From Swiss-Prot:
Endpoints of the signal sequence: none
Subunit structure: Interacts with MNS1 and ODF2.
Keyword annotations of the record: Cell projection, Cilium, Coiled coil, Cytoplasm, Cytoskeleton, Flagellum
Coiled-coil region(s): 55-198, 271-361
GO CC annotations on file: axoneme; ciliary basal body; sperm flagellum
Disulfide bonds: none
Function: Plays an essential role in sperm motility and male fertility by stabilizing the sperm flagellar axonemal structure. May be required for the stability of ODF2 and MANS1 proteins. Dispensable for the assembly and function of motile cilia.
Disordered, as annotated region: 1-22, 510-529
Biased segments, Basic residues type: 1-13
Protein name: Basal body-orientation factor 1
Species per Swiss-Prot/TrEMBL record: Macaca fascicularis
Superkingdom to which the source organism belongs: Eukaryota
InterPro entries in alphabetical order: DUF4515
Top-level taxonomy: Eukaryota, Metazoa, Chordata, Craniata, Vertebrata
Family recorded in the similarity comment: Belongs to the BBOF1 family.
């Protein structure tokens, strides 16, 4: 049973394979037919295109032959035309030479005529300028007069306003004065009447009181009457004083009234004078205005003539400017070339200066360092000298030794035994011969050497001091507290050192200080502290 089933399956599979082979063969045949038809169509298309290309090549060959023939004809025509043009150019060159000669002749004639015209017109211009200046002066005088007239008119308006204000002020003051007078008179009469009434009342009251007291106390009558009399005298004196003050006020008001009346009269007189001046000035203004109109017409006529002459001269100047513009262009071209050369020189100079500044900075740093060392050494030496002096003074006070010489440490000018004198000894070139090592020199001498080298490098003459001569006074002094008091500006010295500024170096050897003081003539003084 199982073997039969397997045979059936194998038969079915073989039938399927044969069907697949048949289908593949049919598909290959169809593809071949399609390819053949496609290649046939392509062949036909290529044949047609070949025929077309053959026809076009024939037509192009014919047209090429025609163009060659035309080219030959054109070349012949061009040769003939060129020969004709050359002849014409030769004739034109001859004509140009003749015209150049004529042009030079005409230029010479025109230059002569131009010189004559320039002389003529310069004379006319000078005459016109003289006339113009005269007229301008006259017009300036008229303008100044007009300005004065206008200022007078403005001043007149101001004066009129001031007069009106003064009139109003006078009226107001008169009114106020009269009101105050009325008020004061009424107050004065009222006060007078009131005081009289009060006095009468007091007298009546005092009389009644005196009568009653006389009746009651007849023993004390004299004493009370005396007191009342004293009181009444004081009251009367007070009222009389008030009356005198009121009279003084009334007198002052009367005096002020008189002054105001006097001022009013003066103002009236001034107003009359100003009115007379205004009338005169109006007549002067009218005459001046007529003169101005006449001068303006004359000035307009002169300006027209002057403008016409100026236009002519401007035309001549334009022609000359056009001729000079060509020369200006040439000069500008030369200037540009010179500027380029100058820029190159500047670049070279800048490079040289940049290289030079590096050396200058090195020397400046060295000088600065030497100065710092000098300051430190001087400060240290002062401290040591002061300590030694103090020890000797203490020993002398104790009676062990004699008192030393007085010594100053504040750098005074007239001191005979100062520490600065010892410090200045370090600047002297004593006991020094040739071939000296720089390490054996003092800091002050090192600074001098550096400055001398820097001056020689810059090409500046250096100052020379003899050994016997006194060096310059230092620009600073080290105080007891250790602070440096500078009398000179170090920045100025550094600015003067640069070669780019072309300023000679100043020998500031007085500013340098030594850490170690050489043995000199003052050694005996320092040893006897």
């Amino acid at each position: 049973m199982p073997s039969k089933g397997k045979d059936k399956k194998k038969g079915k599979s073989r039938g399927k394979d044969t069907k697949k082979l048949i289908k593949t063969d049919e598909s290959v045949v169809d593809r071949a037919k399609a390819n053949a038809s496609l290649w046939e169509a392509r062949l036909e298309i290529t044949e047609l295109s070949r025929i077309e290309y053959r026809d076009t090549s024939r037509t192009l060959a014919k047209s090429n032959e025609d163009l060659k023939k035309k080219q030959c004809k054109m070349e012949k025509d061009i040769m003939s035309v060129l020969s004709y043009l050359k002849k014409q150019d030769q004739e034109k060159d001859n004509m140009i030479e003749k015209l150049k000669q004529q042009l030079n002749e005409t230029k010479e004639k025109a230059q002569e005529e131009k010189d004559k015209l320039e002389q003529k017109y310069t004379r006319q211009i000078d005459e016109l300028e003289g006339q113009f200046h005269q007229k301008a002066k006259e017009i300036g005088m008229i303008h100044t007069e007009l300005k004065a007239v206008r200022q007078f008119q403005r001043r007149k308006i101001q004066v009129e306003r001031e007069l009106d204000d003064l009139k109003e002020n006078l009226r107001n003051t008169e009114r106020i004065h009269q009101e105050t007078l009325r008020r004061l008179e009424s107050r004065f009469f009222e006060e007078k009447h009131r005081l009289k009434q009060e006095a009468e009342k007091k007298i009546i009251m005092l009389a009644e009181r005196a009568h009653h007291e006389a009746v009651v106390q007849l023993n004390d009558a004299g004493r009370n009457v005396f007191k009342e009399n004293v009181y009444l005298q004081k009251a009367l004196a007070y009222h009389l004083k008030e009356a005198g003050g009121l009279q003084k006020n009334s007198q002052k008001l009367q005096e002020s009234h008189a002054l105001l009346l006097h001022q009013k009269e003066i103002n009236d007189l001034l107003i009359k004078e100003k009115i007379m001046q205004l009338v005169q000035q109006r007549s002067q203004i009218q005459t001046l205005q007529k003169k101005v109109v006449n001068l303006e017409t004359a000035l307009g006529y002169m300006t027209k003539e002057f403008e016409s002459e100026v236009l002519k001269l401007q035309q001549h100047a334009m022609i000359e400017n056009q001729a000079g513009q060509v020369e200006i262009d040439k000069l500008q071209h030369l200037l540009q070339m010179k500027d380029r050369e100058m820029n190159r020189v500047k670049k070279l100079a800048k490079n040289i200066l940049d290289e030079r500044t590096e050396v200058e900075r090195f020397f400046l740093d060295a000088l600065h360092q030497v100065k710092q060392q000098i300051l430190i050494s001087r400060k240290h030496y002062k401290q040591i000298a002061q300590a030694a002096f103090n020890l000797k003074m203490r020993a002398a006070c104790a009676g062990r030794t004699e008192y030393p010489k007085i010594r100053t440490f504040d750098g005074r000018e007239h001191s005979t035994n100062s520490v600065n004198q010892d410090l200045l000894e370090a600047e002297k070139w004593t006991h020094i011969e040739g071939n000296v090592d720089i390490g054996d020199l003092t800091w002050e001498q090192k600074e001098k050497v550096l400055r001398l080298l820097f001056a020689k490098m810059n090409g500046c003459p250096s100052r020379k001091y003899n050994q016997s001569s006194k060096p310059p006074v230092p620009d600073y002094v080290v105080s007891d507290s250790g602070e440096t008091k500078e009398f000179g500006d170090e920045s100025k010295l550094q600015d003067k050192i640069f070669i780019t500024q072309q300023i000679p170096i100043s020998d500031s050897s007085g500013k340098v200080v030594l850490p170690t003081i050489p043995k000199g003539p003052q050694e005996s003084d320092t040893g006897t502290f």
